[in-house]
């Protein structure tokens, strides 16, 4: 009698599962699937070198349908299981360090960790609106888009990427088109701070906001002659705004913008207007970066020795007089 009873119970369980699996797909399920699709298309400014944030720092991502908040992480990248790592990126279909393609992408698009911001790498010719703001690179915390085109130069190994900063009205228009397509409301807040960390918050429906512990927005630095790194929070990294023609090596690395994890320098304005909103990032090879750092140290040491010599000479003259 016991065996038939368990057979009957097993049969009822299987029947219930069959009935549940045969239920029609509701509109809510379709919307949820579209939202998941949207999330899977997202990219991230991942694997940021924590040493560039003042020897400490952290990286945190928060996600959720009602809104997310990023907290201080442990200083690493947002590596997620089942998301690949491919350092090459010189062939078609390749991605960038910190990102990954699944062997057979579910939706025929690159698959990234859900809830991240959108950026287009230098060697992928697709343009698009970003979902995050980078403070300290443009003269204001505006959204940016990557300009279409495989590279800014002819070589497939080119390490230049043009960022175009978008005005709020244009951003509003593009977001409206995106809302009509997917429904709902999205948002990402990005804050780069000093020792506190780096955080991203993401919300698919309720908007997003985030920030690492102790982080604060870098100032605009849009005044003429402004030092791009001047007045920024300690350890926020060096970046030159779009309307400042001075270049320089950054103090931190951004993976996801170039195909290798290297420091970048800003190039002079891409247009003549002082209100130009385009910025060309040129990614520097590690050897070049090392050489220029060594050269800068030699120049600084020489300046210090010269200043010390002049000071000593003035003191000797004062004693003689």
UniProtKB/Swiss-Prot annotation:
It comes from the Eukaryota. Anther specific (tapetal cells). Residues 301-321 are annotated as: Disordered. This is Anther-specific protein TA-29.
